[in-house]
Curated annotation (Swiss-Prot):
The keyword Nucleotidyltransferase applies. It catalyses: alpha-D-glucose 1-phosphate + UTP + H(+) = UDP-alpha-D-glucose + diphosphate. Pfam families: NTP_transferase (PF00483). This is UTP--glucose-1-phosphate uridylyltransferase. It comes from Streptococcus pneumoniae. The lineage of its organism: Bacteria, Bacillati, Bacillota, Bacilli, Lactobacillales. It comes from the Bacteria. The gene is cap3C. Keywords: Capsule biogenesis/degradation, Exopolysaccharide synthesis, Nucleotidyltransferase, Transferase. Its EC number is 2.7.7.9.
Length: 306
């Protein structure tokens, strides 16, 4: 039985929701307090037992490669000044074994995953999307990627992470048509549907950015026709795979943080900051004071006195 040791992280998107910042900085490098978002994804991979990581990048993504490269001058300066805690935090990213490949143009998630074919070979692997951060404020939780790996060890089948969303939001996701719950939280699936209309959605169980796939997915992606948004959709390829071999869905019951838009990015930053040992107390006091200030403004507004 082949073990799951490889992870693929697509990071070639243009990040248009965060312009103009992403004109010069990769979206995956936007910081949650003091760590870029991609750091949390890779941290989840390592905690799950992943040994080899491939990041699929595109143009203007050099900052990701720089983050995982050593910086001799900085490390020397920190060591000379005796700033060993900062040095340790810098080395967190340079001690990780990360490979890179470039997607020539953004043609969809399916095409990004296809760029990993030679890296993956004949092994099962996980795909981890950077817009979804899982349980980043709970270091005791079993990582979602680890849960998918455990499912694979039991079934030897591809398994996709899903989570309930509001029906009015299903058109932003791929969703599943569940057949039955074969064990606690693990579903057999009739179909995978990319971004359905709410009235046509087979369920509200949405795919949330963690996939464990068998290598047979690549032969499907090589001939996959463009789908929603005129892009090569990974969900469509998974639905095709499900017709020849079982693909399961694992319902995630932890805390998912969506960092794909400004509002949810800020919510994630606040939640994480309120757990950060260096700033949590000061931030908590500030948030409480700000809440009281906003209540006063609301009271004045409702009474007509500003």
């Amino acid at each position: 039985m082949k073990k799951v040791k490889k992870a693929v992280i697509p990071a070639a998107g243009l990040g248009t929701r965060f312009l103009p910042a992403t004109k010069a900085l990769a979206k995956e490098m936007l910081p949650i307090v003091d760590r870029p978002t991609i750091h949390f994804v890779i941290e989840e991979a390592l905690r799950s037992g992943i040994e080899d990581i491939l990041v699929v990048t595109g143009k203007s993504k050099r900052s990701i490669e720089d983050y995982f490269d050593s910086t001799f001058e900085l490390e020397y300066s920190l060591r000379k000044q005796g700033k060993m805690e900062l040095l340790k935090s810098v080395n967190e990213s340079t001690d990780i074994k990360v490979h890179f490949v470039r997607q020539s143009s953004p043609r969809g998630l399916g095409d990004a995953v296809l760029q990993a074919k030679s890296f993956v070979g004949d092994d099962p692997f996980v795909v981890m999307l950077g817009d979804d951060l899982m349980d980043i404020t709970d270091s005791t939780a079993v990582p979602l990627t680890r849960q998918l790996m455990d499912d694979y060890n039991a079934t030897q089948a591809s398994t996709i992470a899903v989570m309930p969303v509001r029906y009015e939001d299903v058109s932003s996701y791929g969703v599943i048509s569940p057949r039955l719950e074969s064990s606690n939280g693990l579903y057999s699936v009739d179909a995978f549907v990319e971004k359905p209309k709410p009235e046509e959605a087979p369920s509200n169980l949405a795919i949330i950015g963690r996939y464990l796939l068998t290598p047979e997915i690549f032969s499907i992606l090589e001939t996959q026709k463009p789908g929603a948004g005129n892009e090569i959709q990974l969900t469509d390829a998974i639905d095709t795979l499900n017709k020849t071999q079982s693909v399961f869905a694992r319902e995630f019951v932890g805390k998912r943080y969506d960092v794909g838009d400004k509002f949810n990015f800020m919510k994630t930053s606040i939640d994480y900051a309120l757990q950060h040992p260096q700033i949590k107390e000061s931030l908590k006091n500030y948030v409480i004071a700000l809440g009281k200030q906003l209540e006063k403004l609301d009271d004045c507004s409702s009474s007509g006195h500003l």
